């Protein structure tokens, strides 16, 4: 009896451990496969290449627009908004990893000048917190606080992303100066077409790997197709695998050529990048400018008063 209870307890513990392991694997795998910024973080030390191209474009092949809006100038140690807009047709549906259709997600990378960083929560005003919503930003690297990533997040809710940014203070950071700085941004809507290892996702076109005749099209049980192509010249058979998602454009008995599209292009998203400029303004320069404007206004006032006084003197002399 005691041995039976011991066996039951061991069996229960093993089952629980296996279940927990499976849950952890699924959660981890899902988060990595869906989160495009993680791909960039894992594969590239810097998201912006020397050519100016942001590396996210290596996986998101379609070119789409983005828009970045920042203040023209900011003072040191000041929180300001950087607003990224990722426009797209909200009615569109994308092909998900399982081949079904679903809403588009969005993601972004913001490359700030050295010294600029994400504003700490205690410096963000309630109004700005409301604009940000439930978004959670993270640094590209622990030592690159000026590069921020976000996503994937639902596109219908966050096609406009507000970044809370804290400007640096040159008095505290000697490598920061009062200058005009560039800001770079990249934003995507929808899934990519290529994974970092070079393999295709199911959100792209699949082409024939051989010239020949489509001998057989087998629909797989879990979705997708297995296409047998026979080369008419030597009888060699090639099998092309199509994952769930793309729609077939060929049929059995059809003659095809090398690199001919076997499927439609299911991709409705894309990636875009842009840039803006911001001036880190010296407060003393602003004060000097205000003093100059005040001096000009006072000079104008005194000039008008002097003119009025001169006109009165002239009028007095004419009366005599």
From Swiss-Prot:
Q: Where in the cell is it found?
A: Plastid, Chloroplast thylakoid membrane
Looking up Gene3D superfamilies in the UniProt record yields:
2.40.50.100, Cytochrome f large domain (2.60.40.830), Single helix bin (1.20.5.700)
Q: Its membrane topology, per UniProt?
A: Single-pass membrane protein
Using the chain's own numbering, where are the disulfide bonds? none
| Entry-linked Pfam families | Apocytochr_F_C, Apocytochr_F_N
Q: Which domain of life is it from?
A: Eukaryota
UniProt GO BP: photosynthesis
Keyword Heme among record annotations: yes
* Cellular component terms per the entry's GO annotation: chloroplast thylakoid membrane; plastid
As for family, the record states: Belongs to the cytochrome f family.
Protein name per UniProt: Cytochrome f
Q: Which gene encodes it?
A: petA
């Amino acid at each position: 009896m005691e041995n039976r209870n011991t066996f039951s307890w061991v069996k229960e513990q093993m089952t629980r451990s296996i279940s927990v392991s499976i849950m952890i694997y699924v959660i981890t795998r899902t988060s990595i496969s869906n989160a495009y910024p993680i791909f960039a973080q894992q594969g590239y030390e810097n998201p912006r290449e020397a050519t100016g191209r942001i590396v996210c474009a290596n996986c998101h092949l379609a070119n789409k627009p983005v828009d970045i809006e920042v203040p023209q100038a900011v003072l040191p140690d000041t929180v300001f908004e950087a607003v990224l807009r990722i426009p797209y047709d909200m009615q569109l549906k994308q092909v998900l990893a399982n081949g079904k259709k679903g809403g588009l997600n969005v993601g972004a990378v913001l490359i700030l000048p050295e010294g600029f960083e994400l504003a700490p929560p205690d410096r963000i005003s309630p109004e700005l917190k409301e604009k940000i919503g439930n978004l959670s930003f993270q640094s590209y690297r622990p030592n690159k606080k000026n590069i921020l990533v976000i996503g994937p997040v639902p596109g219908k809710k966050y096609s406009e992303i507000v970044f809370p940014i804290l400007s640096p203070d040159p008095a505290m950071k000697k490598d920061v100066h009062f200058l005009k700085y560039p800001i770079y941004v990249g934003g995507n809507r929808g899934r990519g077409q290529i994974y970092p290892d070079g393999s295709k996702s199911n959100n792209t076109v699949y082409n024939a790997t051989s010239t020949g005749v489509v001998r057989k099209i087998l629909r797989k049980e879990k979705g997708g197709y297995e296409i047998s192509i026979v080369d008419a010249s030597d009888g060699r058979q090639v099998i092309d695998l199509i994952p769930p998602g793309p729609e077939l454009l060929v049929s059995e008995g059809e003659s095809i050529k090398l690199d001919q599209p076997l499927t439609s292009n299911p991709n409705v998203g894309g990636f875009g990048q842009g840039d803006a400029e911001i001036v880190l303004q010296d407060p003393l320069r602003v004060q000097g400018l205000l003093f100059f404007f005040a001096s000009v206004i006072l000079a104008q006032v005194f000039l008008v008063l002097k003119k009025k006084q001169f006109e009165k003197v002239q009028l007095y002399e004419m009366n005599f």
